Structure formats: structure tokens, C-alpha cells
């Protein structure tokens, strides 16, 4: 006979089936026809979806808050997104929906997704292109229908929240074949005239067909080209259009756009008060810190130096500290002088070498130029001698004058450069001397502060030493008294437990005559045996004549 599995409770089996369905069918899409549609006052929708052969129960929780613009009815062809689960009390599996699309809208949704992906790939929805909204706009542009409730809601919110504002309304058609073109033209006109600081594109809720104008590519491109920040307030919170993705900010509703575009006067006042409180607190904290620091410095400056004869260890400490200070100062001065000499010698040497090189280059260039001019003059002179024409003589004189002027100008430039270098060298030498004097003053000041701090530290250490010494003596006295009392108590206990003191009160001690051990029980005695008895003032030998054992006896 085959071994059967243990029986399961119905609840356990139902839970297992429920977990299996929910884990394997967590996201499904079902297409069919609605039947038995029931919308409860709580906002939950219960329905059945069927085709020609099968039927499936379903539920859509909080349906009314998400799809209040259209109520489904029996016979509607829909596409439902959801998951499978089990309703345990009846043991029925059902679909729990989280999105419902009417079958006629499926093609539009597919077109919406395709256009969205293409425009996103082209960079129209890039986060880097988003413009920040002005904190306090002076003029607000609204592109919407002038006759709808949307513009009234926006104006009501603005009048309640904003202190001073201007609204420029550009009337357009928000539904139909011409709506997309009118809206894009309105955006272009607003950007061309530069009359507003921020734009709001608004429309009330509706089906996907009603809102399709805001999914047109022409509007997305107009928003992308806009230099004015744009807020998209199209439809309800659950409605999404391509206009929302392209805009700089998306508002869930037109009323929310009125709250986003203009910060309320009370909020501005609260922010200002918050900043003012922060500045006051920060200033108070800063002043308190500076006052505390000044008081601390004042205590240091007002400290009266005094010296009392310290112990020998404190003298050694002072000598050691002074020696350490002198050594440190000496080493610092020596290193400073060494660095200064190194800097001075190195820089002066490099400057000297540089000037010498420049002077050599100048002389060499001058000599080369002069030699070249001499050769040129000799050549010209030969030509003059050979040809003996007045034309060469007339050309030679201006060239000679020009050459002399150029040489004089070049020589003057080099002399000015040399003078400038010498001035820089003197300035640098002066700076080094000033720095040396400044560092020497700082070292002397540091030495004075260290001496003053040393005196203060020595006095403070001496007071701490005396205080610790006094505490040590007090602690030792307390410890001695405590051990003395403990010794007295233990001595009294030893005296009270001494057997000899017990014998003084009339008691006696028995010892075995042969083994010389104490007898504590009558069972260890025998008739005619000998025992020794010890009294207060002596011992005696006794013979046992009779032995009686007692079971228990209380005194």
C-alpha cells in the first residue's frame, strides 16, 4: 500500500495555491468583455471579464479615485493589467487590476509609447535641459481655454497665495485637430515677446482621446525650444502626456500648478523669518564665542606672575624646561639663519650669474652687430669707391643713422632691464630683512609667552602636588585606621574563640591517653579505658567506669 501524504487543512491548501498563483502570475494583461460590473460606494470596482469560452472574476480597488471621468459598464471591451490571486473565503481565483484601458485606446497607447521612446532617444526629455522656476515671478503666462473652469481655478489659487502678480492669458483650443498647432504657436509667441517669467500649459481631465493634442510632437519641440520655464498641468494626477515629460515641471492638476508657480506670501514671510532667526542665532553664537575667547585672553593677560619656593623636583623641572626652550630657540634660529643665508646666497648668486650672462649676451650681440655693420660699411665703402656714385652715399647716411638709433634704443632697453633687475634684487633683500626682523620678534614674543606659561605651569603643578600630597596623607590615615579597627575586631574574635578562655568558665577538655588527641564523642570511649582531662590550672588522669550514649539532647 502506497504511503499517502499527511492531510492538509483547507486554509493551508488555499494559502499554498494563493502563493503559487501570486508568485507566477504577478503581472498579467488580459483582454475581454466586461460583465457584472458593480461599482461600490467605497470606490472599489467588482467585475467579470469574459470571452466566448471563459469567464474570470476581478476586482479593482480604489477605482473611483483613479478613473472618475468614465464609468465602465457591461459589454465594454477592455484591456486589464493586474495579477492573479485567490479569494480565500470562497476558494476562487480572480484578477486584481491596477490599470484598465478601453480597447479603443490600445492603439493610441501604443502610439504614445512609441513616440515617447523616440523623443526620449532624441533628447527632448533630458533632465539637463530642465530650467529652474523663478522664485517670485512678476508676470505669469497661462496657455489654456478662456472659458473653462481651469483658468478660474488657477486665478483663484494665485489670488489667494500671491501678494503681487500679473497674469497674461493666451486663449487656445485644448481639444481637437487644431489644438496642438495653436498651443505650439502660443509658446512661440510668448518666447518671442518675452512678456512673462514663467508659462503654464493647463487643461482639465479627460480620456486619452481628449488629451491627445498634448501628445503631439509639435508641442514637445516647441517646449524644448522655449527659453521660458514651462509648467505642464494637463489632466488629473493619473493622466500623463508627452507635454508633461518635455516641460520643466509637471503639476498633477491645474490647481497644483497655481500653487507651484507662485510661492505663497505666508511661505515667503516664514522663509524670511526663518533666515532672520538663523542669522540672529548665528550672530549671537558668534558674538558669544568671541566674548568667551576675549575673556579667556583677558584672564591670560591679567594673570599675576608670582613664584613660591618649589620642591627640588620642581626646580629640576624648571631647569629642564628652560634648557629645552633655549635649545629649541637656538636650533630654530640656527635653521632660520641657515635658510636665510642659503636663500640669499643662492638667489644673489643666481641673479648675478643671470645678469652676467645677460651682459655677456648683450656685449656679444653688440660686438656681432657692430662687426656686421663694419663689414657692411666696408662693403658699401668699396662699392662707393668702385662706383663713386652719389646715390649710394645718400642711401648710406640714413641707414647709418637708423642703425645708430636702433643700437642706442636696444642698449637703453638693456640698461633699463638691468636697472629693473637691480631694483627687484634690492626689494627682495629688503623683504628678507623685514621677514628676519619679524620672525625674530615673533621668536622673542614666543619666548616671553613660554616663560610666563612656564611660571604659571610650575605654580599650578606645585599646587596640584601639594593637594595630591595632602590627599595621600589623608587616604593613608583612613587606611591605617580602617586596618587598625579590623585588627582589633579580629583580635577580639580570636580571644573569644581561644579554648583556654573556655576552660576558665568551668569547662574541661578530654584527651586520649595514648594518642593524645581530643575526644569529642562518647562513642570513642570504652569502659576501663584511661583518659587525660585538662582543667584551667592543670591535668589529671581518669579511668572510665561507665559510658552512656545520648541520641539527641538539647540544652
UniProtKB/Swiss-Prot annotation:
Protein localization: Cytoplasm
Pfam families: Exonuc_VII_L (PF02601), tRNA_anti_2 (PF13742)
InterPro entries per record: Exonuc_VII_L, Exonuc_VII_lsu_C, OB-fold_nuc-bd_dom
Main location: cytoplasm
One GO-annotated biological process of the protein: DNA catabolic process
Keyword tags: Cytoplasm, Exonuclease, Hydrolase, Nuclease
Superkingdom as given in the UniProt entry: Bacteria
UniProt-recorded Gene Ontology molecular function terms: exodeoxyribonuclease VII activity; nucleic acid binding
Catalysed reaction equations from the record: Exonucleolytic cleavage in either 5'- to 3'- or 3'- to 5'-direction to yield nucleoside 5'-phosphates
This protein's GO CC annotations: cytoplasm; exodeoxyribonuclease VII complex
Enzyme Commission number, as recorded: 3.1.11.6
HAMAP family (UniProt xref): Exonuc_7_L
Subunit structure: Heterooligomer composed of large and small subunits.
Role noted for this protein: Bidirectionally degrades single-stranded DNA into large acid-insoluble oligonucleotides, which are then degraded further into small acid-soluble oligonucleotides.
NCBIfam families tied to this protein: xseA
Family statement drawn from the similarity comment of this UniProt entry: Belongs to the XseA family.
Protein name: Exodeoxyribonuclease 7 large subunit
Organism this protein belongs to: Chlamydia abortus (strain DSM 27085 / S26/3)
Organism lineage: Bacteria, Pseudomonadati, Chlamydiota, Chlamydiia, Chlamydiales
